[in-house]
Design a protein with these regions (language model features):
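Short coil turns that delineate tetratricopeptide repeat
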Residues: 73, 107, 151-152, 185-186, ...
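Terminal, low-structured helical/coil segments at or just beyond the last alpha-helical repeat
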Residues: 337, 341-371
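Single-residue signature of alpha-solenoid repeat helices
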Residues: 9, 61, 95, 140, ...
Length: 371
């Protein structure tokens, strides 16, 4: 209404605003604050709901769920989405009733049972099972089994295996994961999950490694492999196989984006074990760059600089560590040791004393050496 005139919406403009599943991405529609109607075909409506999920508030999304249920009452999708909203609000009775209604009305009964299993499983993982006693892992398993009885899809057996894993039934979960590698569901993920089950069964390291090798091998064929290189690298690191771990970490680094500071820190730890100082310096620098407020990383950087006699760089890292955490003894201890190496005796004593005051038992021994 820029010039104070009220204008009627142009009829052609209204026609152009015809809703399709991808209209969520349309800038013109996003600028109108009115909640757009769902498309008239189920698939397009599901697409739009999926896109809307990250763009709207939970309450607005719940209204879409209601609209979806009224437009497509025989689709299992709407009931699941609305019940998830109710679960988040701790309205468990209402969520349970809605899922039961969905099972009665849905054309694809297998999907409805599987959705119910998933809702219970997610709720227990994130909120525990003490709240709302009717929802147990056993009930989730029963729902997944009903889905499989109606339609023998391997995905429903996979769901049951994942619930068994959370329940602590590791052998049962392992057996199913391995069975499923002979189905259309074959993926690196199945071998990775089987490896996790074996780990919890305290199996020999070699058995776990063979499963992780399979996860990498299958993952390479399907193009979904980064996380399996990372998982195998972490496993090899735990086994003290640092050189092989680094090879896997390097593969992960070459294909995964974005990479977290924790990753670079883990690889740095392996590199220092092998005295690979140059790559270790690069990785601890990357770690600190990506996590500029984490004092322990700067302490590690200062510590490595001390080891490789880069005293000025080390003093800079230790000083930054102290700025971030004035009560963290390691920063003062490292700064003192670096200053001692630089011949700055007075400052070294001052910082080592500060580390001692903050409870570092090593500082006293170093102080004797400076004096």
């Amino acid at each position: 209404h820029s010039n104070g005139q009220v204008t009627a919406i142009d009829a052609n403009y209204a026609k152009q605003l015809k809703v399709t599943g991808l209209s969520s991405l349309d800038a013109a529609l996003r600028q109108t604050t009115i909640r757009t109607a769902l498309p008239d075909t189920e698939n397009e409506a599901m697409t739009m709901m999926t896109l809307k999920k990250g763009q709207t508030t939970a309450d607005v999304y719940a209204k879409y769920s209601d609209e979806f249920i009224s437009k497509f009452p025989t689709s299992a999708f709407g009931y699941k989405e609305k019940a998830a909203y109710l679960t988040d609000k701790a309205e468990y009775d209402a969520a349970a009733k809605l899922m039961e209604e969905g099972i009665k009305k849905s054309a694809a009964k297998d999907e409805a049972h599987s959705n119910y299993a998933d809702l219970i499983y997610q709720k227990i993982i994130y909120k525990g099972d003490s709240v709302y006693k009717d929802w147990t892992l056993d009930k989730a398993i029963a729902e997944a089994q009903k889905a499989y009885e109606i339609k023998a899809q391997p995905i429903y057996r996979h769901q049951e295996a994942q619930i068994n894993f959370v329940k602590g039934e590791y052998q049962k979960a392992y057996d199913t994961f391995m069975d499923l590698t002979n189905t259309s569901l074959l993926s690196g993920e199945l071998y990775f999950e089987a490896a996790q089950a074996k780990k919890n069964l305290k199996a020999p390291a070699k058995e776990i490694e063979v499963l992780l090798d399979s996860a990498v091998s299958v993952g390479n064929k399907t193009g979904m492999v980064a996380n399996y290189y990372l998982a195998r690298g972490e496993f090899l690191k735990e086994q003290g196989e640092f050189r092989r771990a680094i090879q896997d970490y390097n593969m992960y680094d070459s294909i995964a984006r974005p990479v977290s500071p924790a990753f670079f820190y883990t690889r740095y730890q392996c590199e220092t074990k092998l005295r690979m100082w140059q790559p270790a310096l690069l990785d601890i620098a990357r770690t600190c760059y990506l996590a500029p407020k984490e004092p322990t990383y700067f302490a590690e950087w200062a510590s490595l600089d001390l080891r490789v006699k880069r005293y000025d760089e080390g003093i800079s890292a230790a000083t930054h560590c102290i700025e971030l955490a004035p009560e963290y003894a390691d920063g003062y201890l490292l700064l003192g040791l670096l200053q001692k190496e630089k011949g700055n005796k007075e400052e070294a004593i001052k910082n080592l004393k500060k580390a001692q005051e903050l409870g570092d038992s090593r500082a006293g021994e170093y102080l004797k050496k400076v004096k």
